[in-house]
Amino acid sequence: MEFILDTADLEAVKQLDELLTIDGVTTNPAIITRSGKQPEEVIKEFVEYLLPEQKFFVQVVSTDYEQMLEEARYICGLRPENTYVKIPVTRNGYKAIKQLKSEGFGVLATAIYSADEAFLAAMNGADYLAPYVNRMCNYGDGIGQVFDLMQMLETHGLNSKILAASFKNTEQVHALIAAGIDAVTLPPDIVYTMMGHPGTKIAVEEFSAAWREAYGRDTLLNRSGF
């Protein structure tokens, strides 16, 4: 499974990259605008920072077919390996996905609100499909829709990977990971919640207190004895 960060905050990525195995970064127009930086600066920072094996996902902004292709080619040209252009599943988007795949570009179909939308993008050859899990829940059973999509892809032998996005809580993430999802992309706050169970802190504090009481120090080795 691929574990990806959904953010344009490079410092947040660096911090989590030291703690966990991070497979890449996703961005979108809204996330980039919240960075307070120019888009060219944000993209350049990540192109320079990410390791070759880490994936980078950047979304087109234009809704015009020809301009979508132009933006997609520009994005992939900045970092030819392991860069994927994100294309919303509009009518022009489906057309662009089909064309870009014929040119050999990596494509993630995004802004997906139903299993049917995702399935059609998979038929066009999209490498990744990004269902907006929590937003789908606002219209019905979002988790169930993703389960349906997993079955649809398997039944018809399609190789697109599901990169689940738009999570509100860790319960949604847990449900999809447990079901065998291909990939998730998460904002840093959700990631920290996943690793921050209060019971862990209590247990560590109890271990430390017992050790200090018995040995009068906070380390395994008694350095003064060397």
Regions found by a protein language model. Name each.
Residues 2-14, 19-22, 26-99, 133:
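Active-site beta->alpha loop and helix N-cap motifs at the rims of alpha/beta catalytic domains
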Residues 11-19, 67-71, 75, 96, ...:
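Catalytic cores of alpha/beta
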Residues 20-24, 79-81, 99-108, 123-130, ...:
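Glycine-enriched alpha-helix->loop->beta-strand junction motifs that scaffold or abut catalytic
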Residues 28, 85, 121, 176, ...:
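Conserved, mostly hydrophobic/aromatic
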Residues 29-32, 111, 128-139, 180-200:
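Glycine-rich phosphate-binding active-site loops on the catalytic face of alpha/beta enzymes
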Residues 34-45, 64-70, 87-102, 114-122, ...:
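Active-site-adjacent beta->alpha loops and helix N-cap segments on the catalytic face
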Residues 40, 44-56, 78, 94-106, ...:
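Alpha-helix-loop-beta-strand connector modules within alpha/beta enzyme cores
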Residues 153-226:
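C-terminal alpha-helical cap/extension of soluble enzyme domains
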